[in-house]
């Protein structure tokens, strides 16, 4: 069975408030995630919300990586969508554990665009 894309949806709970509010750190962490996944960044956009929260998007040649934070809820939502390769979600969670403080991760792997 062939698919057009692979979508990884990551929900992180019990995240550290101060880390979520450190916009520069979150931007660098997201860029390094793209590098760790061996993807090519072609565009990026980041927005700091007031009084708190952050959203970021990396357009990669393979598709996109996005992050949204809710410091008041100690929550991060990350999406990784690619049209070229599947990723080992365990390696991604290991990377996130090395770079973010959180208590619980929920991951959904979605195969997109089934081709007959």
Swiss-Prot record:
This entry's Enzyme Commission designation comes to 4.1.1.50
Catalytic activity, as annotated: S-adenosyl-L-methionine + H(+) = S-adenosyl 3-(methylsulfanyl)propylamine + CO2
PTM (free text): Is synthesized initially as an inactive proenzyme. Formation of the active enzyme involves a self-maturation process in which the active site pyruvoyl group is generated from an internal serine residue via an autocatalytic post-translational modification. Two non-identical subunits are generated from the proenzyme in this reaction, and the pyruvate is formed at the N-terminus of the alpha chain, which is derived from the carboxyl end of the proenzyme.
For this chain's record, the cofactor binding note is:
Binds 1 pyruvoyl group covalently per subunit.
Cofactor(s) recorded for this entry are: pyruvate
Could you name the domain of life of the organism this protein comes from? Bacteria
What InterPro entries does this protein map onto?
A: AdoMetDC_fam_prok (IPR003826), S-AdoMet_deCO2ase_core (IPR016067), S-AdoMet_deCOase_pro-enz (IPR017716)
Does the record bear Lipid metabolism in its keywords?
no
The site annotation (Cleavage (non-hydrolytic)) covers 62-63
Q: In which pathway does it act?
A: Amine and polyamine biosynthesis; S-adenosylmethioninamine biosynthesis; S-adenosylmethioninamine from S-adenosyl-L-methionine: step 1/1
Per the record, the GO terms for biological process are: spermidine biosynthetic process
Q: Which HAMAP family match?
A: AdoMetDC_1
Described function: Catalyzes the decarboxylation of S-adenosylmethionine to S-adenosylmethioninamine (dcAdoMet), the propylamine donor required for the synthesis of the polyamines spermine and spermidine from the diamine putrescine.
**What is known about its subunit structure?**
Heterotetramer of two alpha and two beta chains arranged as a dimer of alpha/beta heterodimers.
As for family, the record states: Belongs to the prokaryotic AdoMetDC family. Type 1 subfamily.
Q: What is this protein called?
A: S-adenosylmethionine decarboxylase proenzyme
The species this protein belongs to is: Clostridium botulinum (strain Loch Maree / Type A3)
Q: What gene name is listed for this protein?
A: speH
